[in-house]
A protein has these predicted regions:
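Surface-exposed flexible segments
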Residues: 58-74, 188-199, 292-298
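Serine endopeptidase catalytic core focused on the charge-relay Asp
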Residues: 97-252, 256, 269-270
Length: 322
């Protein structure tokens, strides 16, 4: 949706929510190409995508969601009117796809992002792993509840980490776990020669324009491809479970069980650049998933470790995907 900024898409989403939510039982609104018969519709390269709990017949649907919608935006001091075609996406059962954790070792968390930072009192880099917040008990309180966390490695291997922080009101689903480089290598999660140069991260503005871009994820160390379906500026689909999440990518056209239980926290590469962290999937086939902006999660994690340790400027960076 290159024609509109991310802020404009938020405004459009909010306006259309107010207009249609009650009369059409709208679950959410995103932006992407129209799809017909499981293929992209060339007549609708850019659409307003209405998420509904159950699709109606075409005739009945048009009474509630018209083929096109009009809206107004202020540009250069003047109000302008725009019109876009619509698409309807039926929401099946939505599942948070992380494995719930217990501090007694009842589960293992999946992580897809490794970061490093330097604390002033240290001569070495500290390593951290980023995953989802919903893997941990809702009653969790920090710092008194910090404990050793078991993290899934390659095969049957496991390593321990210390939970440093979880997102709360940040409109994210994220947590940060401190780990040791030696343990990452011993658990076959990381190569001994792994470097610490910072890697590129896809921006929210780029995610906004990624409709139909190809993506790659590695749940359980197996490469799985997908295609970007929509960009959702403020995602309400999982509001009852974890609250609203900002800047969400909806992925589809993946193999069965790609986004199933236990795969939350997996990193998504979109157009060959790391762009999102998975937090949910659509049951029962789990061929569709939902990921949050890696850029926003990284900003939260950087601010968190700086508040905790007063890290050296520019030392926090994303260095590896796992």
């Amino acid at each position: 949706m290159r024609e509109f900024s991310e802020a404009e898409l938020r405004a459009i989403q909010k306006s259309l929510f107010r207009r249609f939510r009650k009369r059409a039982e709208i679950a959410d609104i995103g932006f992407g190409p129209g799809v017909r018969a499981n293929r992209q519709d060339p007549q609708r390269p850019a659409s307003v995508c209405f998420y509904v709990r159950k699709k109606r017949t075409p005739r009945d649907r048009e009474k509630h969601i018209p083929p096109t919608v009009k809206f107004r935006l202020k540009r250069r001091g003047k109000m302008r009117q725009f019109e876009l075609p619509t698409d309807v996406i039926e929401v099946k059962k939505l599942v948070l796809s992380g494995v719930p954790m217990s501090f007694s070792g009842g589960g293992s968390v999946t992580g897809g992002v490794l970061v490093v930072w330097k604390e002033p009192s240290q001569t070495y880099l500290t390593w951290g792993l980023i995953t989802v917040r919903h893997a941990f008990p809702a009653s969790l309180s920090l710092p008194q509840s910090r404990a050793n966390i078991r993290i899934a490695g390659a095969g049957s291997s496991r390593l321990s980490g210390t939970l440093l922080a979880v997102s709360s009101s940040a409109r994210l689903d994220a947590s940060l776990i401190r780990v040791k480089r030696f343990d990452l290598v011993a658990a076959n999660i990381m190569d001994p020669t792994q470097g610490t140069n910072g890697l590129a991260v896809r921006t929210v503005d780029q995610l906004r324009d990624d409709e139909e871009a190809s993506g790659l994820t590695r749940p359980r160390n197996t490469d799985r491809q997908f295609t970007v379906r929509t960009f959702i500026p403020v995602c309400h689909l999982f509001e009852q479970q974890i609250g609203v999440i900002d800047s969400v990518v909806h992925a589809h056209y993946a193999a069965n069980q790609t986004f199933s239980s236990g795969t939350s926290g997996s990193l998504w590469r979109i157009a060959n650049i790391s762009g999102a962290i998975q937090f949910g999937g659509m049951s029962p086939a789990f061929r569709e998933g939902f990921g949050q902006s890696l850029e926003l999660v990284m900003a939260w994690a950087k601010e968190t470790v700086d508040d905790l340790f007063g890290i050296e400027p520019d030392s926090f960076r994303y260095v590896a995907r796992i």
